[in-house]
Design a protein with these regions (language model features):
Chain B
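A structural signal for conserved, well-ordered secondary-structure elements
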Residues: 1-302
């Protein structure tokens, strides 16, 4: 019979509806301000006694705790207000040592039965809800020093290949100085080096027992290096934040040497802080031979044992040459990181390993850290940061054969460390170390007034559409409006399930896809009217209307969906967010227009001997 | 039902399109887009109040003093305020802002004033541009596959036409272009494509059904048949957009303008660019229906 659905189709639609309702429900519960404590890289979760100390310290500070939750890898303290949250963070951070990361957070308050179904609310974007704000400072001096170290290493390489003997290199501020046996060696070196490094100002100096060449970076070169460092860090931080899967973040430069990172709403802020602030990098170096002169070697400790090894000062490659890195497990179930090098990195690695088969090569893990001390200055407490660099060998292995573009690193502490190291290598290293200067929650960037007006206008817009459909298509308009409601629930459910972030443009995007959903219904209804005019019976007209409108709807929606998918795969940040909303909207609107309204039409008028349609 | 002779007026429409495109391109070349805080960066001012202020008052005070594109946020606690302005940084801005806010009688101290960089990095800009090009290419392939390559050319030209005119309008009237407007332009692409495909679909159907070869007449029929749908859809969309424009407040205002222009131009271009272009491209019935094969000839033989 015409216009009847088999039972399973009705059941399928009901099932989709039920799932949609459940997963859109969490959005009705507001989030609590909270403080999250999680272990620093590879450490232990907060112990029960530490937690008790935290709780009593909060009670002493007169900060009421709403609840305490212990997760698999973190502890969450829920609080009543944002100002309590700031104070609580200060108290907890002061109490715990460096083994734990303390971060402010907005915790969802989804009831547990919903959370058991893995339902969680949509994150509201920085414009609607605000989020966490990290201010990071880029260590500009370190950027210059790092560049000088690389340059000095290249200079030594040149001198060695030209067989000019040098004694010592020293880096101080923006100056590299090298000692030579005599003035002739120095002059020869100067003419050789100055060809490759035009950015330096060269000066001769006297040294005890020989001659010294001092090379100072020009102001312009220093500016360029610092500019490069901050831009490189911006790119890297953007990559890292995107790798974390944070939708709609904000990463921007602030002032000459700072970077702001803002992350919206309910996120694992502690993890974000660890990854954003991580300065880990790798260096690959050869082990020194017994006869290597002392000034070319450096003694480093292993990370996992007190053993030490004598390594060459010269670095073969650093983590910067890594083009991709993934985490996996070796035969024994220990974590490892698989690394692919870029072209130049691969060539350098191949050249170094080919001529050194049988020697040991070390993988060195470098981390820039700071010690914060509070000192009294002019009667006010002031935090002084002392940066220091930690270098530790994670593996020392014999080179069996020449290495190419891809290989793996073992010897890591934990799967988490392997995952974070691979993420850091993938997203590129920082050109200069960064330090957290400030961490705050930040309010919505749109004023409450603007948000209210925006939401009001969207509601009125929707009401207008609903009224229009009712007026124009009467009973069928009602069906289309019910489908519109279903569509809205489904989009919200899908966005919540995907963990998408809702921003004001996103809301507007949803309204637009609702408009497109209406369009599909309009197409069908107009077609039914047309078929009625050509004299088809009611049931035939309904059937033909859906049938003929089908290709139009599918073609139009699929083309738009293609655009959305491409924007998603290539675009970043806000473009990506918009693409997600649009794709979901298209899929749900096709479902509601083609299946849900059809089911309702079939249920109400399908198969009945009607003479006239209310359309 | 009344029939409009759409195709008869196509010369006038082509001229209108050409003039609009020309104005848009000249304006884009001469005075570019007036890019917003998201793209240009500006100045950040952090102030501390003695008692928590109303953010809307802060915003209004600054707006009244002629600052543009202002975002005001609480920062940590309710009495610490973070202000971002689209204003080239100079050392006095911080003091200027603080003085303005003090004029209201509040106790305000300046914590810091610094420049902030663009939220949209160059990398993002380049990637988005590339994304658009790839998207256009894939759409062209898809339309060529589902319809025919002449349709693909028409659809793409219509899309580019719409985007250039929307951007041109923003440049001409120097309306601020920020990330929200960028989202609107992407939405215009979606909308315009949707509209074009619906008209194309009807044209294809009519060419296959009809017995005449008079393309302008077939096109007119197709456009007239989809006209009520086009008006209903554009009508509802414009209703929503008008609501956003009038009631939505500052942030949605420009978004609504972009889409209103886009929907208008998009509807126009589905008829007069995408469809009318098929005439100079010499679309024929044989492009959609494979030419009769030999076996049909065989039947006619005695």
């Amino acid at each position: 019979m015409l216009n009847r659905y088999p039972l399973w189709k009705y059941l399928l639609i009901l099932l989709v509806l039920a799932v949609g309702l459940v997963y859109s429900l969490p959005n009705l519960f507001p989030a609590d301000p909270a403080v999250q404590i999680s272990p620093a890289s590879g450490g232990e979760n907060l112990s029960e006694s530490q937690l008790e100390r935290v709780q009593s310290a909060l009670a002493d500070a007169d900060i009421p705790l709403k609840s305490t939750e212990r997760g698999a890898n973190s502890v969450l303290l829920r609080l009543d207000s944002a100002s309590d949250q700031m104070r609580a963070r200060g108290v907890v951070d002061g109490l715990l040592d460096d083994d734990h990361v303390v971060a402010v957070n907005l915790a969802e308050s989804t009831p547990s039965w919903l959370r058991d179904l893995a339902a969680s609310p949509m994150t509201l974007g920085l414009d609607l809800r605000g989020g966490v704000h990290f201010l990071l400072e880029v260590d500009m001096d370190a950027a210059v020093t790092q560049r000088l170290e690389v340059n000095a290493s290249a200079m030594r390489e040149t001198l060695r290949s030209e067989r000019i003997r040098y004694r010592n290199t020293e880096i101080d501020g923006r100056t590299v100085s090298m000692d030579f046996m005599n003035a002739e060696d120095r002059d020869e070196a100067k003419s050789l080096i100055s060809r490759d490094f035009p950015d330096f100002q060269y000066a001769d100096a006297e040294a005890d027992r020989g001659a010294r060449l001092s090379m100072t970076l020009s102001d312009q070169a220093v500016d360029e290096i610092q500019d490069y460092a901050i831009n490189q860090n911006l790119t890297t931080l953007r990559n890292r934040v995107n790798e974390l899967g944070v939708a709609e973040p904000l990463v921007q430069r602030q002032g000459p040497n700072r970077i702001v990172v803002e992350l919206p709403g309910v996120q694992d802020t502690a993890a974000a802080k660890r990854v954003v602030g991580a300065t880990a990098n790798l260096e690959f170096r050869l082990e020194a031979r017994p006869d290597t002169p002392e000034q070319e070697t450096e003694t480093l400790q292993f990370r996992s044992s007190p053993r030490t090894a004598e390594l060459m000062r010269d670095v073969i490659i650093t983590g910067d040459s890594v083009s991709s890195a993934t985490r996996s497990f070796d035969e024994n179930g220990r974590p490892q990181v698989n690394i692919d090098l870029d072209g130049t990195g691969g060539t350098l690695m191949n050249r170094a390993t080919r001529s050194n088969i049988g020697r040991n090569m070390a993988v060195v893990f470098i981390e820039h850290k700071t010690n914060d001390r509070t000192v009294m200055k002019d009667g006010k407490p002031e935090v002084v940061r002392d940066p220091y660099t930690e270098r530790g060998i994670i593996s020392l292995a014999t080179i069996q054969s020449a290495l190419g573009n891809s290989f793996r690193i073992t010897g890591l502490d934990s799967p988490t460390e392997a995952a974070e190291l691979s993420l850091l290598l993938r997203s590129g290293s920082l050109a200069a170390p960064i330090y957290f200067v400030q961490e705050r929650t930040i309010g919505p960037s749109l004023g409450q007034d603007n948000i209210d007006r925006g939401i009001l206008s969207v509601q009125i817009g929707l009401l207008l559409v609903v009224a229009f459909m009712l007026l124009r298509y009467k009973a069928f308009g009602l069906i289309a409006n019910v489908a519109l409601g279903v569509n809205l629930v489904l989009v919200i459910a899908a966005m919540s399930m995907l963990g998408a972030t809702l921003t004001l443009p996103g809301i507007a995007g949803i309204v637009l896809t609702l408009g497109m959903a209406v369009d599909a219904n309009v197409l069908i209804f107009e077609r039914i009217r047309e078929e009625l005019r050509t004299g088809l019976s009611v049931q035939q007209a309904i059937h033909a209307g859906y049938e003929r409108a089908f290709t139009s709807i599918v073609d139009a929606n699929l083309t738009t969906l293609l655009v959305a998918l491409i924007l998603f795969s290539i675009g970043t940040g806000p473009v990506k967010g918009f693409a997600v909303t649009l794709s979901l909207g298209i899929l749900t609107s096709m479902f509601t227009a083609l299946m849900v309204t059809r089911a309702m039409v079939n249920l109400t008028v399908g198969g009945k001997p009607l003479k006239k349609l209310w359309i | 039902m009344r029939q409009f002779d759409f195709m008869g007026k196509r010369r006038l429409a082509f001229t209108t399109s050409a003039v609009m495109l020309l104005i848009a391109l000249v304006s884009l070349a001469v005075q570019q887009l007036s890019l917003g805080l998201d793209f240009t960066g500006g100045t950040l001012v952090e102030v501390s109040y003695h008692t928590a202020p109303s953010l809307d008052t802060v915003r209004q005070t600054l707006e009244a003093a002629g600052f543009q594109d202002i975002s005001v946020q609480t920062f940590g606690t309710a009495d610490e305020i973070l202000i971002r302005l689209q204003q080239a940084f100079d050392p006095n801005v911080g003091q200027q802002v603080t003085d303005l806010l003090r004029a209201g009688g509040d106790q305000v101290t300046l914590v810091r004033a610094e420049f902030v960089g663009a939220q949209v990095g160059e990398q993002l800009r380049d990637q988005s541009g590339l994304g658009m090009l790839v998207a256009l290419g894939v759409v062209m392939l898809y339309v060529a596959f589902r319809f025919q390559y002449k349709f693909a050319v028409g659809a793409i030209v219509a899309l580019i036409h719409d985007v250039i005119i929307v951007l041109g309008a923003f440049s001409l009237f120097q309306i601020e272009f920020d990330l929200t407007v960028l989202a609107a332009v992407l939405a215009v692409i979606g909308y315009s494509l949707n509209d074009t495909i619906i008209v194309y679909d009807r044209i294809r159907e009519n060419i296959r059904l009809s017995r005449i070869d008079d393309m302008p007449a077939i096109f007119n029929d197709a456009i007239n048949q989809t006209l009520s749908r086009t008006l209903a859809t554009s009508g509802t969309t414009i209703l929503v957009l008008l609501a956003l424009l009038v009631l939505g407040g500052d942030m949605i205002h420009n978004f609504a303008i972009a889409l209103l222009i886009g929907v208008g131009v998009g509807t126009f271009s589905s008829i007069y660019v995408a469809s009318a272009l098929l005439l100079p491209l010499k679309l024929q019935r044989t492009d959609l229906i494979p030419a009769p094969k030999e076996n049909e000839d065989a039947e006619e033989l005695p």
